[in-house]
Amino acid sequence: MTTEKKTMNISEIQELLPHRYPFLLIDRVVDFQEEKYLHAIKNVSVNEPQFTGHFPQLPVFPGVLILEAMAQATGLLAFKSFGAPSENELYYFASVDGAKFRKPVVPGDQLIIEVEFIKERRGIAAFTGVAKVDGDVVCSAELKCARREF
């Protein structure tokens, strides 16, 4: 029995996340299951503004932006799992633990971001995340996001 993958295009992503260029780091969601997992894509282009300074002679996608892409993926999964926050609430990136960077990510790479829901308690949701390029893990971390008023 095959199950149809649930996806999100950029318009659907922008309905859920408040981020916009140049800080929206999820291009497409290729599959997700509420309260389980979400798989997303980030296409890395040399035209992105961070490459003017990181580093001009040898452009490398900053590790903190890989973590931010993972955090945005957890936010999308939280929205789909627990519903959209009210008008005065957001899912905030609350913490990152055990981050490991294994290989550099460069222009032309396609990041596959995979986050998995672990648990939720008092409005704080825990996830594991990995980012891959060509099937190789380039980054892994444990992340938390919190639903809070602003």
Curated annotation (Swiss-Prot):
Q: Where in the cell is it found?
A: Cytoplasm
Q: Which reaction does it catalyse?
A: a (3R)-hydroxyacyl-[ACP] = a (2E)-enoyl-[ACP] + H2O
Active-site annotation: H54
Chief location: cytoplasm
Query: GO cellular-component terms in the record?
Result: cytoplasm; membrane
The GO molecular function terms of this record are: (3R)-hydroxyacyl-[acyl-carrier-protein] dehydratase activity
Q: Which UniProt keywords apply?
A: Cytoplasm, Lipid A biosynthesis, Lipid biosynthesis, Lipid metabolism, Lyase
Pfam families hit by this protein: FabA (PF07977)
Q: Might you give the EC number(s) for this enzyme?
A: 4.2.1.59
* Gene3D superfamilies per UniProt: Hotdog Thioesterase (3.10.129.10)
UniProt GO BP: fatty acid biosynthetic process; lipid A biosynthetic process
Sequence similarity: Belongs to the thioester dehydratase family. FabZ subfamily.
Q: Which HAMAP family match?
A: FabZ
Q: Which named protein is this?
A: 3-hydroxyacyl-[acyl-carrier-protein] dehydratase FabZ
Q: Which organism is it from?
A: Vibrio vulnificus (strain YJ016)
